[in-house]
From Swiss-Prot:
Motif window: Nuclear localization signal (NLS): 573-583
GO biological process, one term: cell division
Coiled-coil portions: 567-622
Function: Component of the integrator complex, a multiprotein complex that terminates RNA polymerase II (Pol II) transcription in the promoter-proximal region of genes.
Protein name (database record): Integrator complex subunit 13
Cystine crosslinks: none
Domain of life: Eukaryota
Organism: Xenopus tropicalis
Positions with biased composition (Basic and acidic residues): 565-625
Region feature Cleavage module binding motif (CMBM), mapped onto this chain: 650-695
Gene that produces this protein: ints13
UniProt-annotated location(s): Nucleus; Cytoplasm
Database matches in InterPro entries: Cell_cycle_regulator_Mat89Bb (IPR019355)
Length: 707
């Protein structure tokens, strides 16, 4: 259905009965010449407006704001009701301007206070308003012509704003019942006519206005649905400026408007031409101009305030005089027509004239801290003033930033191609054939699309380095069908074949596409790679196992293939040993040389530690009174180590330095063994004194060698 909102048609019904000529009792100072008054002249008495004048001024202000911001497609029909109903204009676009309405109102004139009140009623105007809503506007006729046989798809909605002086709540209820009955009667007439349209929805706004100082006989009531066609609300408002404020609030609610107050506007004073003062001007515009402020919430922005006696908040922007080139301005993301709230005030007229002369005004956000942020600009185009929204953050024309930024830098390996395929599989489209749920009720296509999206995103890694199976072409047959709501027998067989192929790949020890980004070395070993792959595949299948029994069969097949027999584990161990040997063989000779030197230095360090322990133990034994004095001994050293050290042809290694230091320290600690000093070829003869004492010949004493 082509939607025409309730704001497309607005019918004003203003009471023109005699009681509307009563004074509103809100005085206005007529004589404002308080200075330089000649002596003896009596000032003019203050005046007060009638209820009729207050109602017309407030309704005209409503229409002015609407025409300023929405010059097209928002229409007003003005009706005056007394002894009958008189329509001041039509739905034609040519009649939609304030000049036509003001000229028609001038012809009608104020209500006659001497007229018979019994002959006057607001009901005449309400009935005429319902008839007017049934008439087709040019925009509705254009839409009906485009749709041809589907012309009934064009909606007809409208709003009736009635300003009157009601007697009581029961009188208001009678007016609502009259409107409700009239709508049903005219809908029956419109059903059989090609020139009328049935009313699908009508919003009735009843405004009871009364003089200032009197008690209201009518109570306020929020929106209430009286029927499937009529919604009504009641406002009880004092006349004068209170009525104007109420209509100002309603026009913002009815047309989704927002308020912006321009502060610190420099203006020359009339009395003092050389000085200037700062003024404020409040503007109304569409609320989309404040979308950027939602993004700025919590970033130091401090420009929202509530106006007195107003439901809506206003956003404060400061007049800005930047020292930057216009080329440095951000891109404009939107332009919205504006309308001053107090159009006749001197600051408003000065600002509008300044803009209509071709000038532009930059506006900045008042912030508690931080740098200046220019968020809006006022400028005129073709005699109309627009509020331009400037992008205060990243330009919408630039490439978006990286989704996340980790400790290693921006993430760049997103699965962009896979995500494009994912969007293609989950795009929304019209669904012609109706489907039914298990309980027999109709299945909503939107809910079905949400369920499919939920299934596809149960396990979907976003980064290439975080997944293994989605980088393997061999897993595609399983990953593409496991997300289905129900599997066929052929799907189950394809999934099982995929699992068997993976088992065969593991048996052949085929490499896997494991990402080594951000890791040092060669990455995980082959069996560890397959363990990661099987774990991820199990996570994917387990996320969808509750779908059906066939999903469970795929899961059972996967778990059965993961449990390996003992001979398979033994083969894996042999494979790991072979890989270790291959890695050692692949090491360069320089690396092996460094390892040997390191092992030798470790051996020397362990020898030194043992020496220290022996020395400490010897000191303890020596200090005890009962222990004999131990002989001085030299630690066991290899024979080849005792030889003279060859001079190195190059720089000495760490091992040579340690060996030289150890030999020097040992030579200083102990006296050399007498037998070693007198030995021949490092062999000493023992017990020589026994031969000399006994004089025995040919007796060979025991010999020992000590190294």
């Amino acid at each position: 259905m082509k939607t025409f909102s309730e704001s497309h048609k607005t019918v004003f019904v203003v009471d023109h009965c005699p009681y509307m000529s009563e004074s509103c009792r809100q005085h206005v100072e007529f004589d404002m010449l308080t200075k330089n008054r000649t002596q003896g002249i009596i000032p003019l008495a203050p005046i007060s407006k009638s209820l009729w004048t207050c109602a017309i001024e407030a309704s005209m202000e409503y229409c002015r704001i609407m025409y300023d911001i929405f010059p097209f497609r928002k229409l007003v029909n003005f009706i005056v009701s007394d002894s009958g109903s008189r329509t001041l204009n039509s739905w034609n676009q040519e009649d939609q301007n304030l000049q036509e309405l003001m000229a028609a109102l001038a012809v009608i004139g104020p209500p006659n206070p001497r007229a018979d009140p019994e002959c006057c009623s607001i009901l005449h105007g309400l009935v005429e308003a319902v008839e007017s809503l049934c008439k087709i506007t040019d925009y509705q006729h254009e839409s009906r012509t485009e749709l041809m046989e589907n012309a009934d798809r064009v909606a007809n909605r409208g709003r009736i704003i009635c300003i009157t002086n009601a007697k009581s709540d029961s009188h208001v209820q009678m007016l609502e019942d009259c409107v409700n009955e009239t709508i049903h009667e005219h809908n029956k007439l419109a059903a059989g006519s090609d020139h009328l349209m049935q009313i699908q929805k009508c919003h009735l706004v009843l405004i009871h206005t009364y003089p200032v100082g009197e008690d209201s006989l009518v109570s306020d009531r929020p929106k209430k649905e009286l029927s499937n066609v009529l919604i009504s609300e009641v406002h009880s408002v004092k006349a004068g400026r209170h009525l104007s404020t109420k209509l100002n609030q309603l026009v913002q609610l009815h047309f989704d408007l927002a308020s912006t107050t321009i502060t610190n506007i420099p203006m020359k004073e009339e009395q003092h031409a050389n000085t200037s003062a700062n003024y404020d001007v409040e503007l109304l515009h569409h609320k989309e101009a404040h979308v950027e402020f939602n993004k700025s919430a919590g970033e130091g922005y401090n420009g929202s305030s509530s106006r007195e006696n107003c439901l809506k908040e206003t956003v404060t922007l400061k007049w800005c005089t930047p020292r930057t080139n216009s080329v440095e301005l951000h891109y404009c993301t939107g332009a919205f027509r504006i309308s001053p709230v107090d159009v006749n005030s001197r600051p408003s007229s000065c600002l509008t004239n300044f803009l209509l002369n071709g000038r532009s005004v930059l506006l900045e956000q008042p912030r508690k801290s931080g740098s200046k942020v220019i968020s809006h600009m006022l400028s005129s185009h073709g005699g109309e003033i627009f509020l331009h929204v400037l992008s205060s953050s990243r330009s919408i024309l630039e490439d978006p930033p990286s989704i996340s930024e980790g400790c290693g830098g921006r993430v760049t390996d997103y699965r962009i191609t896979d995500f494009g395929e994912f969007m293609r599989e989950n795009r929304l489209m019209p669904f012609a054939e109706p489907r039914y749920c298990m309980d027999g009720g109709p299945e909503v296509p939107l809910e079905r699309a949400k369920e499919q999206l939920e299934r596809h995103t149960r396990y979907w890694p976003m980064i290439i380095s975080q997944t293994t199976i989605f980088n393997m072409q061999a897993v595609v047959p399983l990953a593409s069908v496991i997300v289905k709501e129900s599997l066929s027998e052929e799907d189950v067989l394809n999934c099982q074949k995929t699992i068997y192929n993976l088992v065969d790949m593991e048996r052949k020890n085929d490499p896997l596409p494991i990402s080594t980004a951000g890791t040092r070395g060669k990455g995980p070993k082959r069996d560890e790679q397959y363990r990661i792959m099987w774990n991820e595949l199990e996570t994917l299948v387990r996320a969808h196992v509750r779908g059906s029994d066939r999903h469970q069969r795929v899961m059972d097949c996967l778990m059965a293939c993961r449990s390996k027999p003992p001979e398979e584990e033994e083969r894996k161990k042999r494979g790991r040993k072979r890989e270790d040997k291959e890695e050692k063989a692949e090491k360069p000779p320089k690396e092996n040389e460094h390892e040997k030197k390191w092992q030798e230095s470790e051996r020397v360090k362990s020898v030194l530690d043992r020496e220290k322990e022996d020395l400490a133990e010897a000191e303890v034994i020596k200090d005890s009174p009962d222990s004999p004095e131990p002989p001085n001994k030299k630690p066991h050293i290899m024979v080849e180590d005792t030889g003279p050290a060859e001079k190195s042809k190059g720089p000495m290694s760490l091992l040579s330095l340690w060996s030289s230091r150890i030999n020097t320290a040992n030579s200083r600690k102990h006296q050399e063994f007498v037998g070693r000093l007198n030995s021949v070829n490092n062999k000493a003869e023992l017990y020589q004194h026994l031969k000399e004492e006994n004089g025995a010949e040919g007796v060979e004493n025991g010999k020992g060698s000590r190294q």
